[in-house]
Amino acid sequence: MPQLSLSWLGLGPVAASPWLLLLLVGGSWLLARVLAWTYTFYDNCRRLQCFPQPPKQNWFWGHQGLVTPTEEGMKTLTQLVTTYPQGFKLWLGPTFPLLILCHPDIIRPITSASAAVAPKDMIFYGFLKPWLGDGLLLSGGDKWSRHRRMLTPAFHFNILKPYMKIFNKSVNIMHDKWQRLASEGSARLDMFEHISLMTLDSLQKCVFSFESNCQEKPSEYIAAILELSAFVEKRNQQILLHTDFLYYLTPDGQRFRRACHLVHDFTDAVIQERRCTLPTQGIDDFLKNKAKSKTLDFIDVLLLSKDEDGKELSDEDIRAEADTFMFEGHDTTASGLSWVLYHLAKHPEYQEQCRQEVQELLKDREPIEIEWDDLAQLPFLTMCIKESLRLHPPVPVISRCCTQDFVLPDGRVIPKGIVCLINIIGIHYNPTVWPDPEVYDPFRFDQENIKERSPLAFIPFSAGPRNCIGQAFAMAEMKVVLALTLLHFRILPTHTEPRRKPELILRAEGGLWLRVEPLGANSQ
Protein backbone atom coordinates (compact mmCIF):
# COMPACT_ATOMS: atom_id res chain seq x y z
CA MET A 1 0.00 0.00 0.00
CA PRO A 2 1.41 3.47 -0.84
CA GLN A 3 2.91 5.39 2.06
CA LEU A 4 2.11 9.06 2.69
CA SER A 5 4.65 11.13 4.57
CA LEU A 6 3.10 13.53 7.09
CA SER A 7 6.37 14.42 8.77
CA TRP A 8 5.54 18.10 8.31
CA LEU A 9 2.71 17.52 10.80
CA GLY A 10 5.06 15.72 13.17
CA LEU A 11 3.76 12.31 12.06
CA GLY A 12 5.65 9.46 10.47
CA PRO A 13 4.74 7.66 7.24
CA VAL A 14 1.12 6.39 7.22
CA ALA A 15 -0.89 4.32 4.83
CA ALA A 16 -2.48 6.56 2.17
CA SER A 17 -6.09 5.37 2.49
CA PRO A 18 -8.61 6.59 -0.12
CA TRP A 19 -10.57 8.36 2.62
CA LEU A 20 -7.49 10.30 3.74
CA LEU A 21 -6.74 11.31 0.16
CA LEU A 22 -10.37 12.37 -0.29
CA LEU A 23 -10.18 14.40 2.92
CA LEU A 24 -7.01 16.13 1.74
CA VAL A 25 -8.48 16.91 -1.69
CA GLY A 26 -11.70 18.21 -0.12
CA GLY A 27 -9.80 20.28 2.43
CA SER A 28 -7.57 21.73 -0.29
CA TRP A 29 -10.60 22.62 -2.43
CA LEU A 30 -12.34 24.26 0.53
CA LEU A 31 -9.18 26.18 1.44
CA ALA A 32 -8.82 27.38 -2.15
CA ARG A 33 -12.46 28.58 -2.17
CA VAL A 34 -12.01 30.41 1.13
CA LEU A 35 -8.81 32.06 -0.09
CA ALA A 36 -10.44 33.06 -3.40
CA TRP A 37 -13.48 34.50 -1.59
CA THR A 38 -11.24 36.35 0.87
CA TYR A 39 -9.16 37.84 -1.94
CA THR A 40 -12.28 38.91 -3.88
CA PHE A 41 -13.85 40.38 -0.74
CA TYR A 42 -10.82 42.49 0.20
CA ASP A 43 -10.27 43.51 -3.43
CA ASN A 44 -13.91 44.66 -3.65
CA CYS A 45 -13.56 46.51 -0.33
CA ARG A 46 -10.58 48.38 -1.74
CA ARG A 47 -12.38 49.22 -4.99
CA LEU A 48 -15.54 50.31 -3.17
CA GLN A 49 -13.70 52.86 -1.02
CA CYS A 50 -14.57 55.53 -3.59
CA PHE A 51 -18.24 55.21 -2.57
CA PRO A 52 -19.10 57.13 0.62
CA GLN A 53 -21.01 55.51 3.44
CA PRO A 54 -22.87 56.80 6.51
CA PRO A 55 -21.64 55.78 9.99
CA LYS A 56 -22.39 52.12 10.76
CA GLN A 57 -25.04 51.20 13.31
CA ASN A 58 -22.89 48.39 14.65
CA TRP A 59 -19.46 46.95 13.82
CA PHE A 60 -20.97 43.52 13.06
CA TRP A 61 -24.45 44.30 11.68
CA GLY A 62 -23.22 47.27 9.68
CA HIS A 63 -26.06 49.51 8.51
CA GLN A 64 -28.90 47.04 9.14
CA GLY A 65 -31.80 48.91 10.71
CA LEU A 66 -30.66 52.29 9.39
CA VAL A 67 -33.31 52.53 6.64
CA THR A 68 -36.39 50.69 7.87
CA PRO A 69 -39.59 50.09 5.84
CA THR A 70 -41.41 52.83 7.78
CA GLU A 71 -42.14 56.54 7.51
CA GLU A 72 -39.08 57.21 9.69
CA GLY A 73 -36.97 55.06 7.36
CA MET A 74 -38.22 57.06 4.37
CA LYS A 75 -37.16 60.29 6.06
CA THR A 76 -33.75 58.80 6.85
CA LEU A 77 -33.38 57.82 3.19
CA THR A 78 -34.24 61.36 2.08
CA GLN A 79 -31.54 62.74 4.40
CA LEU A 80 -28.99 60.24 3.06
CA VAL A 81 -29.80 61.20 -0.54
CA THR A 82 -29.34 64.87 0.35
CA THR A 83 -25.96 64.06 1.96
CA TYR A 84 -24.81 61.63 -0.76
CA PRO A 85 -26.62 62.71 -3.97
CA GLN A 86 -24.38 60.57 -6.20
CA GLY A 87 -25.15 57.40 -4.24
CA PHE A 88 -23.70 55.64 -1.22
CA LYS A 89 -22.69 52.28 0.21
CA LEU A 90 -24.37 50.27 2.97
CA TRP A 91 -23.18 47.12 4.72
CA LEU A 92 -25.68 44.37 5.54
CA GLY A 93 -23.60 42.55 8.11
CA PRO A 94 -19.78 42.42 8.03
CA THR A 95 -19.36 40.96 4.53
CA PHE A 96 -22.25 42.08 2.30
CA PRO A 97 -21.86 45.53 0.69
CA LEU A 98 -24.79 47.13 -1.10
CA LEU A 99 -24.59 50.14 -3.42
CA ILE A 100 -27.52 52.57 -3.31
CA LEU A 101 -27.71 54.48 -6.60
CA CYS A 102 -29.84 57.63 -6.55
CA HIS A 103 -28.72 59.88 -9.43
CA PRO A 104 -29.77 59.65 -13.12
CA ASP A 105 -26.20 59.84 -14.42
CA ILE A 106 -24.99 57.10 -12.09
CA ILE A 107 -27.74 54.59 -12.94
CA ARG A 108 -27.38 54.94 -16.73
CA PRO A 109 -24.77 52.16 -17.24
CA ILE A 110 -26.85 49.73 -15.13
CA THR A 111 -30.26 50.48 -16.63
CA SER A 112 -28.94 50.36 -20.20
CA ALA A 113 -27.24 46.97 -19.67
CA SER A 114 -28.87 43.81 -20.97
CA ALA A 115 -30.77 41.41 -18.71
CA ALA A 116 -27.83 38.99 -18.90
CA VAL A 117 -25.24 41.58 -17.81
CA ALA A 118 -27.28 43.18 -15.00
CA PRO A 119 -29.91 40.62 -13.93
CA LYS A 120 -32.31 41.14 -11.06
CA ASP A 121 -30.87 40.07 -7.73
CA MET A 122 -32.95 37.16 -6.45
CA ILE A 123 -32.32 37.98 -2.77
CA PHE A 124 -35.05 40.59 -3.12
CA TYR A 125 -37.33 38.75 -5.58
CA GLY A 126 -36.79 35.04 -4.87
CA PHE A 127 -39.80 34.65 -2.56
CA LEU A 128 -42.09 35.31 -5.54
CA LYS A 129 -40.66 32.40 -7.55
CA PRO A 130 -43.04 29.63 -6.33
CA TRP A 131 -45.97 31.85 -7.30
CA LEU A 132 -44.81 33.66 -10.46
CA GLY A 133 -42.33 31.17 -11.90
CA ASP A 134 -40.13 32.32 -14.79
CA GLY A 135 -42.30 35.20 -15.96
CA LEU A 136 -40.84 38.50 -17.19
CA LEU A 137 -40.41 39.77 -13.64
CA LEU A 138 -38.13 36.94 -12.48
CA SER A 139 -36.58 35.36 -15.58
CA GLY A 140 -33.24 36.37 -17.05
CA GLY A 141 -30.87 35.82 -19.96
CA ASP A 142 -32.10 34.36 -23.24
CA LYS A 143 -35.42 33.24 -21.77
CA TRP A 144 -36.26 36.78 -20.66
CA SER A 145 -35.25 38.21 -24.07
CA ARG A 146 -37.37 35.65 -25.94
CA HIS A 147 -40.43 36.21 -23.73
CA ARG A 148 -40.08 39.99 -23.90
CA ARG A 149 -40.13 39.87 -27.72
CA MET A 150 -43.12 37.53 -27.74
CA LEU A 151 -45.12 39.54 -25.19
CA THR A 152 -44.54 43.00 -26.66
CA PRO A 153 -47.47 42.66 -29.15
CA ALA A 154 -49.79 42.02 -26.17
CA PHE A 155 -49.35 45.66 -25.16
CA HIS A 156 -49.78 47.21 -28.62
CA PHE A 157 -52.41 49.96 -28.60
CA ASN A 158 -54.65 47.90 -30.92
CA ILE A 159 -54.84 45.25 -28.17
CA LEU A 160 -55.24 47.84 -25.39
CA LYS A 161 -58.01 49.88 -27.06
CA PRO A 162 -60.83 47.38 -26.36
CA TYR A 163 -59.78 47.22 -22.70
CA MET A 164 -61.10 50.76 -22.25
CA LYS A 165 -64.68 49.47 -21.91
CA ILE A 166 -63.48 47.06 -19.22
CA PHE A 167 -61.79 49.90 -17.30
CA ASN A 168 -64.95 52.03 -17.53
CA LYS A 169 -67.19 49.20 -16.35
CA SER A 170 -64.96 48.23 -13.41
CA VAL A 171 -64.60 51.78 -12.10
CA ASN A 172 -68.36 52.35 -12.42
CA ILE A 173 -68.97 49.30 -10.22
CA MET A 174 -66.60 50.78 -7.63
CA HIS A 175 -68.37 54.14 -7.84
CA ASP A 176 -71.79 52.54 -7.32
CA LYS A 177 -70.41 50.99 -4.14
CA TRP A 178 -69.00 54.37 -3.04
CA GLN A 179 -72.37 56.05 -3.66
CA ARG A 180 -74.09 53.40 -1.55
CA LEU A 181 -71.54 53.68 1.28
CA ALA A 182 -71.73 57.49 1.25
CA SER A 183 -75.54 57.39 1.46
CA GLU A 184 -75.18 55.12 4.51
CA GLY A 185 -72.80 57.58 6.18
CA SER A 186 -69.58 55.65 5.44
CA ALA A 187 -67.79 58.23 3.31
CA ARG A 188 -64.34 57.53 4.83
CA LEU A 189 -62.74 54.82 2.70
CA ASP A 190 -59.43 52.97 2.45
CA MET A 191 -58.36 53.70 -1.11
CA PHE A 192 -55.97 50.75 -1.27
CA GLU A 193 -58.71 48.26 -0.38
CA HIS A 194 -61.29 49.53 -2.85
CA ILE A 195 -58.93 50.26 -5.73
CA SER A 196 -57.09 46.92 -5.38
CA LEU A 197 -60.38 45.06 -5.85
CA MET A 198 -61.26 47.27 -8.80
CA THR A 199 -57.90 46.70 -10.55
CA LEU A 200 -58.14 42.94 -9.92
CA ASP A 201 -61.65 42.97 -11.38
CA SER A 202 -60.33 44.69 -14.53
CA LEU A 203 -57.34 42.38 -14.79
CA GLN A 204 -59.38 39.19 -14.58
CA LYS A 205 -61.42 40.45 -17.53
CA CYS A 206 -58.37 41.62 -19.52
CA VAL A 207 -56.22 38.55 -18.81
CA PHE A 208 -58.80 35.72 -18.68
CA SER A 209 -62.09 37.25 -19.98
CA PHE A 210 -63.47 36.13 -16.62
CA GLU A 211 -66.29 37.88 -14.74
CA SER A 212 -65.63 37.33 -11.03
CA ASN A 213 -67.79 40.16 -9.63
CA CYS A 214 -65.08 40.37 -6.96
CA GLN A 215 -66.02 43.97 -6.09
CA GLU A 216 -69.47 42.86 -4.99
CA LYS A 217 -68.93 39.39 -3.56
CA PRO A 218 -65.98 37.37 -2.20
CA SER A 219 -63.78 35.58 -4.75
CA GLU A 220 -61.54 32.69 -3.69
CA TYR A 221 -59.06 33.43 -6.49
CA ILE A 222 -58.84 37.16 -5.68
CA ALA A 223 -58.48 36.40 -1.96
CA ALA A 224 -55.59 34.04 -2.78
CA ILE A 225 -53.76 36.73 -4.80
CA LEU A 226 -54.15 39.29 -2.02
CA GLU A 227 -52.99 36.68 0.50
CA LEU A 228 -49.91 35.75 -1.57
CA SER A 229 -48.84 39.40 -1.85
CA ALA A 230 -49.19 39.84 1.92
CA PHE A 231 -47.24 36.65 2.70
CA VAL A 232 -44.33 37.62 0.43
CA GLU A 233 -44.01 41.04 2.06
CA LYS A 234 -44.29 39.56 5.56
CA ARG A 235 -41.63 36.92 4.85
CA ASN A 236 -39.28 39.57 3.48
CA GLN A 237 -39.12 41.08 6.99
CA GLN A 238 -38.49 37.74 8.76
CA ILE A 239 -34.83 36.85 8.18
CA LEU A 240 -35.11 33.48 9.96
CA LEU A 241 -37.79 32.38 7.48
CA HIS A 242 -35.79 33.21 4.34
CA THR A 243 -34.85 29.50 4.14
CA ASP A 244 -37.53 27.57 2.24
CA PHE A 245 -37.28 24.51 4.49
CA LEU A 246 -38.08 26.51 7.64
CA TYR A 247 -40.70 28.71 5.98
CA TYR A 248 -42.82 25.84 4.68
CA LEU A 249 -42.95 24.33 8.17
CA THR A 250 -44.77 27.42 9.46
CA PRO A 251 -48.55 28.03 9.18
CA ASP A 252 -47.84 31.01 6.88
CA GLY A 253 -45.69 28.85 4.61
CA GLN A 254 -48.39 26.19 4.36
CA ARG A 255 -51.07 28.81 3.59
CA PHE A 256 -48.74 30.36 0.99
CA ARG A 257 -48.35 26.97 -0.70
CA ARG A 258 -52.13 26.36 -0.71
CA ALA A 259 -52.78 29.83 -2.18
CA CYS A 260 -50.16 29.16 -4.89
CA HIS A 261 -51.91 25.92 -5.84
CA LEU A 262 -55.29 27.67 -6.01
CA VAL A 263 -53.99 30.47 -8.26
CA HIS A 264 -52.08 28.04 -10.49
CA ASP A 265 -55.09 25.73 -10.83
CA PHE A 266 -57.29 28.66 -11.92
CA THR A 267 -54.79 29.82 -14.57
CA ASP A 268 -54.13 26.26 -15.79
CA ALA A 269 -57.86 25.62 -16.21
CA VAL A 270 -58.28 28.70 -18.42
CA ILE A 271 -55.23 27.75 -20.52
CA GLN A 272 -56.47 24.17 -21.02
CA GLU A 273 -59.95 25.36 -21.97
CA ARG A 274 -58.48 27.69 -24.62
CA ARG A 275 -56.09 24.97 -25.84
CA CYS A 276 -59.13 22.75 -26.45
CA THR A 277 -60.97 25.53 -28.29
CA LEU A 278 -58.16 26.38 -30.72
CA PRO A 279 -57.87 22.98 -32.51
CA THR A 280 -61.65 22.63 -32.97
CA GLN A 281 -62.14 26.17 -34.31
CA GLY A 282 -58.82 26.79 -36.00
CA ILE A 283 -56.89 30.02 -35.57
CA ASP A 284 -58.85 31.96 -38.22
CA ASP A 285 -62.28 31.06 -36.77
CA PHE A 286 -60.97 31.65 -33.25
CA LEU A 287 -59.85 35.16 -34.20
CA LYS A 288 -63.14 35.88 -36.02
CA ASN A 289 -65.13 34.95 -32.92
CA LYS A 290 -62.84 37.11 -30.80
CA ALA A 291 -63.28 39.99 -33.24
CA LYS A 292 -67.05 39.84 -32.64
CA SER A 293 -66.48 40.40 -28.93
CA LYS A 294 -63.87 43.04 -29.86
CA THR A 295 -61.50 41.84 -27.13
CA LEU A 296 -58.44 39.63 -27.47
CA ASP A 297 -57.42 38.87 -23.90
CA PHE A 298 -53.90 38.30 -22.57
CA ILE A 299 -54.20 34.49 -22.58
CA ASP A 300 -55.31 34.58 -26.24
CA VAL A 301 -52.28 36.65 -27.23
CA LEU A 302 -49.91 34.32 -25.35
CA LEU A 303 -51.44 31.21 -26.94
CA LEU A 304 -51.06 32.67 -30.42
CA SER A 305 -47.54 34.04 -29.89
CA LYS A 306 -44.61 32.44 -31.73
CA ASP A 307 -40.92 33.28 -31.71
CA GLU A 308 -38.65 33.72 -34.75
CA ASP A 309 -38.35 29.92 -35.09
CA GLY A 310 -42.10 29.39 -34.97
CA LYS A 311 -42.03 27.96 -31.44
CA GLU A 312 -44.94 28.66 -29.09
CA LEU A 313 -44.87 29.33 -25.37
CA SER A 314 -45.35 26.28 -23.16
CA ASP A 315 -48.37 26.09 -20.84
CA GLU A 316 -46.01 26.62 -17.89
CA ASP A 317 -44.61 29.79 -19.51
CA ILE A 318 -48.10 31.11 -20.26
CA ARG A 319 -49.15 30.50 -16.65
CA ALA A 320 -46.05 32.31 -15.36
CA GLU A 321 -46.69 35.35 -17.57
CA ALA A 322 -50.42 35.50 -16.73
CA ASP A 323 -49.76 35.20 -12.99
CA THR A 324 -47.01 37.83 -13.24
CA PHE A 325 -49.35 40.25 -15.02
CA MET A 326 -52.03 39.72 -12.36
CA PHE A 327 -49.51 40.43 -9.58
CA GLU A 328 -47.74 43.41 -11.16
CA GLY A 329 -50.87 44.89 -12.69
CA HIS A 330 -53.08 45.11 -9.62
CA ASP A 331 -50.74 46.18 -6.82
CA THR A 332 -48.72 48.80 -8.66
CA THR A 333 -51.75 50.46 -10.27
CA ALA A 334 -53.68 50.43 -6.98
CA SER A 335 -50.73 52.09 -5.23
CA GLY A 336 -50.33 54.71 -7.96
CA LEU A 337 -54.04 55.58 -8.02
CA SER A 338 -54.37 55.75 -4.23
CA TRP A 339 -51.50 58.20 -3.88
CA VAL A 340 -52.74 60.40 -6.77
CA LEU A 341 -56.12 60.71 -5.06
CA TYR A 342 -54.33 61.56 -1.81
CA HIS A 343 -52.41 64.41 -3.47
CA LEU A 344 -55.50 65.74 -5.22
CA ALA A 345 -57.36 65.66 -1.90
CA LYS A 346 -54.53 67.70 -0.33
CA HIS A 347 -54.52 70.17 -3.25
CA PRO A 348 -58.17 70.96 -4.06
CA GLU A 349 -57.11 73.61 -6.60
CA TYR A 350 -55.40 70.94 -8.74
CA GLN A 351 -58.32 68.56 -8.20
CA GLU A 352 -60.76 71.18 -9.48
CA GLN A 353 -58.56 71.94 -12.50
CA CYS A 354 -58.49 68.22 -13.37
CA ARG A 355 -62.25 67.98 -12.93
CA GLN A 356 -62.87 70.93 -15.26
CA GLU A 357 -60.58 69.35 -17.86
CA VAL A 358 -62.60 66.13 -17.73
CA GLN A 359 -65.95 67.95 -17.79
CA GLU A 360 -64.90 69.94 -20.85
CA LEU A 361 -63.80 66.76 -22.61
CA LEU A 362 -66.98 64.80 -21.85
CA LYS A 363 -69.64 67.52 -22.09
CA ASP A 364 -72.77 66.46 -23.98
CA ARG A 365 -71.44 62.91 -24.26
CA GLU A 366 -73.77 60.01 -23.55
CA PRO A 367 -73.01 57.51 -22.16
CA ILE A 368 -70.23 59.05 -20.10
CA GLU A 369 -67.22 56.91 -20.96
CA ILE A 370 -63.53 57.56 -21.44
CA GLU A 371 -62.38 56.34 -24.86
CA TRP A 372 -58.88 55.60 -26.12
CA ASP A 373 -58.56 58.88 -28.05
CA ASP A 374 -59.56 60.82 -24.92
CA LEU A 375 -56.38 59.80 -23.09
CA ALA A 376 -54.25 62.28 -25.03
CA GLN A 377 -56.77 65.06 -24.29
CA LEU A 378 -56.11 65.13 -20.54
CA PRO A 379 -52.74 66.92 -20.26
CA PHE A 380 -53.17 68.40 -16.77
CA LEU A 381 -54.54 65.17 -15.32
CA THR A 382 -51.50 63.40 -16.79
CA MET A 383 -49.18 65.94 -15.17
CA CYS A 384 -50.85 65.34 -11.79
CA ILE A 385 -50.46 61.57 -12.19
CA LYS A 386 -46.77 61.87 -13.05
CA GLU A 387 -45.99 64.20 -10.15
CA SER A 388 -47.67 61.77 -7.77
CA LEU A 389 -45.68 58.88 -9.28
CA ARG A 390 -42.55 60.93 -8.66
CA LEU A 391 -43.32 61.44 -4.97
CA HIS A 392 -44.83 57.98 -4.45
CA PRO A 393 -43.49 55.53 -7.06
CA PRO A 394 -45.38 52.22 -6.70
CA VAL A 395 -42.11 50.25 -6.81
CA PRO A 396 -39.70 52.11 -4.49
CA VAL A 397 -36.52 50.25 -5.44
CA ILE A 398 -35.20 47.72 -7.96
CA SER A 399 -32.12 45.56 -7.53
CA ARG A 400 -29.48 44.50 -10.02
CA CYS A 401 -26.52 42.14 -9.65
CA CYS A 402 -23.45 43.16 -11.65
CA THR A 403 -22.05 40.20 -13.61
CA GLN A 404 -19.18 42.35 -14.84
CA ASP A 405 -17.39 45.55 -13.82
CA PHE A 406 -19.38 48.72 -14.55
CA VAL A 407 -17.55 51.98 -15.22
CA LEU A 408 -19.61 54.99 -14.10
CA PRO A 409 -19.54 58.36 -15.90
CA ASP A 410 -17.39 59.87 -13.11
CA GLY A 411 -14.76 57.13 -13.52
CA ARG A 412 -15.65 55.05 -10.47
CA VAL A 413 -16.03 51.31 -11.00
CA ILE A 414 -18.69 49.00 -9.59
CA PRO A 415 -16.94 45.62 -9.23
CA LYS A 416 -18.33 42.39 -10.61
CA GLY A 417 -20.59 40.56 -8.16
CA ILE A 418 -21.81 43.66 -6.29
CA VAL A 419 -25.56 44.10 -5.77
CA CYS A 420 -26.86 47.57 -6.66
CA LEU A 421 -30.17 49.06 -5.57
CA ILE A 422 -31.54 51.55 -8.07
CA ASN A 423 -33.41 53.61 -5.52
CA ILE A 424 -36.30 55.13 -7.45
CA ILE A 425 -37.50 57.12 -4.45
CA GLY A 426 -33.95 58.38 -3.92
CA ILE A 427 -33.74 59.58 -7.53
CA HIS A 428 -37.17 61.22 -7.33
CA TYR A 429 -36.24 63.02 -4.08
CA ASN A 430 -32.70 63.98 -5.12
CA PRO A 431 -32.40 67.76 -4.56
CA THR A 432 -29.68 68.05 -7.23
CA VAL A 433 -32.21 66.74 -9.76
CA TRP A 434 -35.52 68.08 -8.42
CA PRO A 435 -35.59 71.49 -6.66
CA ASP A 436 -37.80 71.36 -3.54
CA PRO A 437 -38.29 67.62 -4.10
CA GLU A 438 -40.91 67.13 -1.36
CA VAL A 439 -43.31 69.71 -2.84
CA TYR A 440 -46.17 68.40 -5.01
CA ASP A 441 -45.97 70.49 -8.19
CA PRO A 442 -47.60 69.04 -11.35
CA PHE A 443 -46.07 71.79 -13.49
CA ARG A 444 -42.71 70.03 -13.22
CA PHE A 445 -44.13 67.88 -16.04
CA ASP A 446 -45.06 70.76 -18.30
CA GLN A 447 -43.51 70.10 -21.73
CA GLU A 448 -41.02 72.98 -21.37
CA ASN A 449 -39.74 71.72 -18.02
CA ILE A 450 -39.38 68.13 -19.24
CA LYS A 451 -36.89 69.19 -21.91
CA GLU A 452 -34.40 70.35 -19.29
CA ARG A 453 -34.22 67.02 -17.39
CA SER A 454 -32.55 63.69 -17.91
CA PRO A 455 -35.01 60.99 -19.04
CA LEU A 456 -33.69 58.93 -16.10
CA ALA A 457 -34.75 61.58 -13.56
CA PHE A 458 -38.28 60.12 -13.58
CA ILE A 459 -38.47 56.31 -13.69
CA PRO A 460 -41.63 55.05 -11.93
CA PHE A 461 -41.77 52.22 -14.49
CA SER A 462 -38.02 51.51 -14.32
CA ALA A 463 -35.85 52.22 -17.39
CA GLY A 464 -33.82 50.56 -20.10
CA PRO A 465 -34.39 47.10 -21.61
CA ARG A 466 -36.08 45.80 -18.43
CA ASN A 467 -38.56 48.64 -18.05
CA CYS A 468 -42.19 47.82 -17.29
CA ILE A 469 -43.77 46.27 -20.38
CA GLY A 470 -47.25 47.17 -19.10
CA GLN A 471 -46.76 50.89 -18.48
CA ALA A 472 -49.12 51.96 -21.31
CA PHE A 473 -51.78 49.64 -19.86
CA ALA A 474 -51.24 51.09 -16.37
CA MET A 475 -51.35 54.73 -17.49
CA ALA A 476 -54.50 54.14 -19.54
CA GLU A 477 -56.27 52.52 -16.58
CA MET A 478 -55.14 55.26 -14.19
CA LYS A 479 -56.45 58.02 -16.47
CA VAL A 480 -59.83 56.32 -16.91
CA VAL A 481 -60.24 55.72 -13.17
CA LEU A 482 -59.19 59.23 -12.15
CA ALA A 483 -61.21 61.02 -14.83
CA LEU A 484 -64.45 59.23 -13.92
CA THR A 485 -63.78 59.45 -10.17
CA LEU A 486 -63.28 63.23 -10.29
CA LEU A 487 -66.38 63.56 -12.46
CA HIS A 488 -68.58 61.86 -9.84
CA PHE A 489 -66.85 62.58 -6.50
CA ARG A 490 -65.01 65.24 -4.59
CA ILE A 491 -62.06 63.67 -2.78
CA LEU A 492 -61.28 65.10 0.66
CA PRO A 493 -58.43 64.42 3.12
CA THR A 494 -58.92 62.95 6.57
CA HIS A 495 -57.44 64.37 9.78
CA THR A 496 -54.56 61.88 9.90
CA GLU A 497 -51.61 61.92 7.52
CA PRO A 498 -50.78 58.55 5.92
CA ARG A 499 -47.48 56.99 6.93
CA ARG A 500 -45.56 55.52 4.01
CA LYS A 501 -44.69 51.83 4.14
CA PRO A 502 -42.19 50.83 1.44
CA GLU A 503 -42.31 47.09 0.79
CA LEU A 504 -42.31 45.39 -2.61
CA ILE A 505 -44.97 48.03 -3.31
CA LEU A 506 -45.23 51.46 -1.68
CA ARG A 507 -48.19 51.28 0.68
CA ALA A 508 -49.52 53.25 3.65
CA GLU A 509 -49.52 51.87 7.20
CA GLY A 510 -53.06 50.85 8.09
CA GLY A 511 -54.34 51.85 4.65
CA LEU A 512 -54.73 55.18 2.88
CA TRP A 513 -57.96 56.73 4.11
CA LEU A 514 -59.77 59.53 2.27
CA ARG A 515 -63.30 60.92 2.29
CA VAL A 516 -65.47 60.81 -0.82
CA GLU A 517 -68.31 63.25 -1.41
CA PRO A 518 -70.70 62.46 -4.29
CA LEU A 519 -71.22 65.34 -6.70
CA GLY A 520 -74.71 66.27 -7.86
CA ALA A 521 -75.79 65.86 -11.47
CA ASN A 522 -75.42 69.62 -12.03
CA SER A 523 -71.78 69.54 -10.88
CA GLN A 524 -71.05 66.74 -13.35
UniProtKB/Swiss-Prot annotation:
Reactions this protein catalyses: an organic molecule + reduced [NADPH--hemoprotein reductase] + O2 = an alcohol + oxidized [NADPH--hemoprotein reductase] + H2O + H(+); an omega-methyl-long-chain fatty acid + reduced [NADPH--hemoprotein reductase] + O2 = an omega-hydroxy-long-chain fatty acid + oxidized [NADPH--hemoprotein reductase] + H2O + H(+); dodecanoate + reduced [NADPH--hemoprotein reductase] + O2 = 12-hydroxydodecanoate + oxidized [NADPH--hemoprotein reductase] + H2O + H(+); hexadecanoate + reduced [NADPH--hemoprotein reductase] + O2 = 16-hydroxyhexadecanoate + oxidized [NADPH--hemoprotein reductase] + H2O + H(+)
Record's comment on post-translational modification: 4-hydroxynonenal conjugation impairs substrate binding and the long-chain fatty acid omega-monooxygenase activity.
Assigned protein family: Belongs to the cytochrome P450 family.
Record's function text: A cytochrome P450 monooxygenase involved in the metabolism of various endogenous substrates, including fatty acids and their oxygenated derivatives (oxylipins). Mechanistically, uses molecular oxygen inserting one oxygen atom into a substrate, and reducing the second into a water molecule, with two electrons provided by NADPH via cytochrome P450 reductase (CPR; NADPH-ferrihemoprotein reductase).
GO cellular component: endoplasmic reticulum membrane
Obligatory cofactor(s): heme
Tissue: Expressed mainly in human liver, followed by kidney, heart, and skeletal muscle.
Residues noted as binding heme in the record, renumbered to the chain: E328, C468
Sites bearing 4-hydroxynonenal-conjugated lysine, chain numbering: K451
Name of the protein: Cytochrome P450 4F11
InterPro entries assigned: Cyt_P450, Cyt_P450_CS, Cyt_P450_E_grp-I, Cyt_P450_sf, Cytochrome_P450_Monoox
Record carries keyword Iron: yes
EC class of the enzyme, as a word: oxidoreductase
Regulation affecting activity: Inhibition of the long-chain fatty acid omega-monooxygenase activity by 4-hydroxynonenal (4-HNE) conjugation.
Transmembrane segments: 15-37
Source superkingdom: Eukaryota
UniProt keywords, alphabetically: Endoplasmic reticulum, Fatty acid metabolism, Heme, Iron, Lipid metabolism, Membrane, Metal-binding, Microsome, Monooxygenase, NADP, Oxidoreductase, Transmembrane, Transmembrane helix
Keyword NADP carried by entry: yes
GO MF term (any one): oxidoreductase activity, acting on paired donors, with incorporation or reduction of molecular oxygen, NAD(P)H as one donor, and incorporation of one atom of oxygen
Record pathway: Lipid metabolism; arachidonate metabolism; Lipid metabolism; oxylipin biosynthesis; Cofactor degradation; phylloquinone degradation; Xenobiotic degradation
Modified residues (4-hydroxynonenal-conjugated cysteine): C45, C260, C354
SUPFAM superfamilies, alphabetized: Cytochrome P450
EC number from the UniProt entry: 1.14.14.1, 1.14.14.79, 1.14.14.80, 1.14.14.78
4-hydroxynonenal-conjugated histidine: residues bearing it: H261, H347
Subcellular location field: Endoplasmic reticulum membrane; Microsome membrane
